[in-house]
Amino acid sequence: MAKEIKYDMDARDLLKKGVDELANAVKVTLGPKGRNVIIEKKFGAPHITKDGVTVAKEVELTCPFENMGAQLVKEVASKTNDNAGDGTTTATVLAQSIIGVGLKNVTAGANPMDLKRGIDKAVAKVVESIANQAEAVGDKFEKIEHVAKISANGDEAIGKLIAEAMQRVKTEGVITVEEAKGTETTVDVVEGMQFDRGYISPYFVTDTEKMECQMENPYILIYDKKISVLKDLLPILEPTVQSGRPLLIIAEDIDSEALATLVVNRLRGSLKICAVKAPGFGDRRKAMLEDIAVLTGGTVISEEKGLKLEGATMDMLGTAEKITVDKDTTTIVNGAGDKEAIQARIGQIKIQMENTTSDYDKEKLQERLAKMAGGVAVLYVGAPSEVEMKEKKDRVDDALHATRAAIEEGTVPGGGVAYIRAIDALEGMKGDNEDETTGIEIVKRAIEEPLRQIVANAGKEGAVIVQKVKEGKGDFGYNARKDCFENLCEAGVIDPAKVTRVALENAASIAGMFLTTECVIAEKKEETPAMPPMNPGMGGGMGGMM
């Protein structure tokens, strides 16, 4: 395939056009008065969103050179989304500003490599300033609520729900977002350990209204193979019946004959019992059974350990305060496991999480960790229409990521003020030469841009408000929602420090690459020749046929 090559100014100008096309589409969403973007979908209703990265991912331009520029900025948005989960629009605005001002200087004769060095030095200084401004969240859940509210575009209800979910599952818990069946947005928290396996037979149900099997203070038998004959279970069943306590069997499967005997005894009332299949598959199943054993103070009866079912004793059984089994899930509340053993197991899972490179494995380990340590919360997002539900789900996802980022690295004043306060750190900073100093000035100008854009989206004049915020100190800034100047931290306008940091680092990284580009190569579109017109004498059919 033939290639088309552009050099120098021609190349950079075309790339810049692509950058502006994408950034202008994304930046209208910034701030509390940012607008929505409607994205056409090939099937179904159009997608309405205020999420920067969702908008960025949809942009594809026809000119290959312009499209490359757009893809570079798309990389800024998606990298920021991967690392911090939010701040994608801010990162895009910063990248556009650094590229725009940087390009003017390169055109005027500045050395791109020196400019990049100056930009990198300035960014390091701003990152340091952001870290100094950050305040730890700790157990202050009102801060989490504020962060979630700001990320969800000022939606107080979402802020409250996320704060409630965080409070109940703690930092190690898992929070997932799902679409609700109705119009209400609710949070559902599962205390204790839950896994996605229900009863093997509905005849084990104790509460016929809810179709659940509820067991108080039960014994728990954990076996990693199939139970084929009932006589293997007798050493456990007889003492259990004498104790009068219920028994939960977790096994790979139970043979139909053994299951029928258990069900008959359960219906006669001589045996309080329930059986469920083991969760997970393969090695993950072994790990999850071990988790359940540690949590309940039991032992996994496994031939790998030299243990057989017929030789099982009551010491090998786990116990818990309460177990609820429905057709899809089993929930174990307050397992009687040793606290130190549980902590050791949690530590082990954390080490595995650090060592794994697969995102899928990391997610599954995080789920196991949550079940051991905190709990699992599900946020059900409801809305009157599907289009609104998708838009709301985007905002909830953003808010959730932002709150996690806030817990990691603390919070800074929102509304672009953290960047404005970082300008002081760059005052009087000089590079090794004139072009490096220009690079520092470029960053100094660029970090005003998020505030300018928030103000522009609110319909005000950016320069005037930026100047007034610069004259203030500390948390003093412009609250675009209320259209007033106030202490932003007290007003609850706060951003996660991690999001603020990652947005600038990614924007500067891609902008630096952009400015040091001298040649761009794209595939040349081949002109496909038009089909020749058909000869009128070449009609179908055979001559003389009627």
Swiss-Prot record:
Keyword Aminoacyl-tRNA synthetase: no
Keywords: ATP-binding, Chaperone, Cytoplasm, Isomerase, Nucleotide-binding
PROSITE patterns named among the record's database cross-references: CHAPERONINS_CPN60 (PS00296)
EC number: 5.6.1.7
Pfam families on file: Cpn60_TCP1
Gene Ontology cellular component annotations, sorted alphabetically: cytoplasm
Localization per record: Cytoplasm
Binding site for ATP: 29-32, 50, 86-90, 415, 495
InterPro entries: Chaperonin_Cpn60_CS, Cpn60/GroEL, Cpn60/GroEL/TCP-1, GroEL-like_apical_dom_sf, GROEL-like_equatorial_sf, TCP-1-like_intermed_sf
CDD domains: GroEL
Gene Ontology MF terms in the entry: ATP binding; ATP-dependent protein folding chaperone; isomerase activity; unfolded protein binding
Any Gene Ontology biological process: protein refolding
Substrates-to-products reaction catalysed: ATP + H2O + a folded polypeptide = ADP + phosphate + an unfolded polypeptide
Biological role stated in the UniProt entry: Together with its co-chaperonin GroES, plays an essential role in assisting protein folding. The GroEL-GroES system forms a nano-cage that allows encapsulation of the non-native substrate proteins and provides a physical environment optimized to promote and accelerate protein folding.
Oligomer and partners: Forms a cylinder of 14 subunits composed of two heptameric rings stacked back-to-back. Interacts with the co-chaperonin GroES.
Family under the similarity heading: Belongs to the chaperonin (HSP60) family.
Name of this protein: Chaperonin GroEL
Organism per entry: Parabacteroides distasonis (strain ATCC 8503 / DSM 20701 / CIP 104284 / JCM 5825 / NCTC 11152)
Gene: groEL
